[in-house]
Amino acid sequence: MDSFEQNIKEPNPFWKKVKKGANKTLTFFGVPANTILVFFGVLLLLLTLIPMVSILITTLAVKDPILGNITEFTWNNYYETFAGGNSKGYFWIPLLRSLGVSVLACFFALLFGGITAYLITRTDLKFKKFISAVFIFPYVMPQWTLALFWRNIFVNTEIDWALAYMGEFQALTGIAVPDWMVFGMFPIAFVLGLHYAPFAYILLGGVLRNMDSNLEEAAVILNIPKWKVFFKVTIPMLKPAILSTILLVFSSALSSYAVPVTLGNPTNYYLISTQMEWMINGHDAGIAGMGNVMSVVLIVIGVLILLINQFQTGSRKQFTTVSGKSGQAETKTLGKVGKWVVSIILVALHRSGG
């Protein structure tokens, strides 16, 4: 009898834990911010997990070439993509082209964005506010508009394209530019570099604008040449922003579709994004699985880039300049004529690109 009454008075430890957990859950969801966070977290998980599972299933599926239905599951799609008889033309060449275009796009983005950021933050350039606003236009504009602008300017009747016509440049000058300037690696990388140049401008411009000039001034006092100050002092301080820009532009350019399909497909210059789309949505159901394998490759590359960014961010060393007062960087003089000429050139370039 006593043991029965004791069991009634003392609840089961399991139910005590359940009740405690329920109270903690109610307390957690009692905060609106936590509820919103969990909701969007679950939504994000579903929007990424379901497509990922679907893609992985498709990579393992073999479809009937005529009926298009799944006949079996095998690793054959992976073998055909990486080591099959058509792997070189279907996968490796487009992948190498994409990597080359992405590297070149990083160069152009750093060139355009870096030079503009330096001119605006370190010189007496005219129309700084206007140029800063206009410089964002190439990124705001859709990629395909920039690609169409390039093609309409430089296309000509001499290129190897069935639908070739006389573009604006040929109509005005009578000069037919070579094929490589209209279609292929160079125009794709150039347009992508122009499109993503605002990334470099924002990241590098922020560092240049807030950079402590004491180190640069100390180097100048020691009679170190200005070009050496730039490469030995300024550039190292910009390294984190440069690396972030490279990772951001590289990953974006690698997965770009609109520009490669406009400036590459007319001459059968396929990158991995356009090749993947052609294989997935093409008329041959037998190679759709290989196209999905390519999408997995793009996802893996994206994850690797994210991990590299996290690693370099976590291992970045912080330096502090101990001084009485932070100095402002010296404004470089472009000259009475130079500042107007450079300003007009930048405005013209960015207006044409936007």
Give names to the regions the model predicted:
Residues L222-I224, P236:
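Glycine/proline-centered hinge or cleavage motifs at structural transition points of membrane proteins
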Residues N69-I70, T74, E217, P225-V229, ...:
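Juxtamembrane inter-helical linkers in multi-pass membrane proteins
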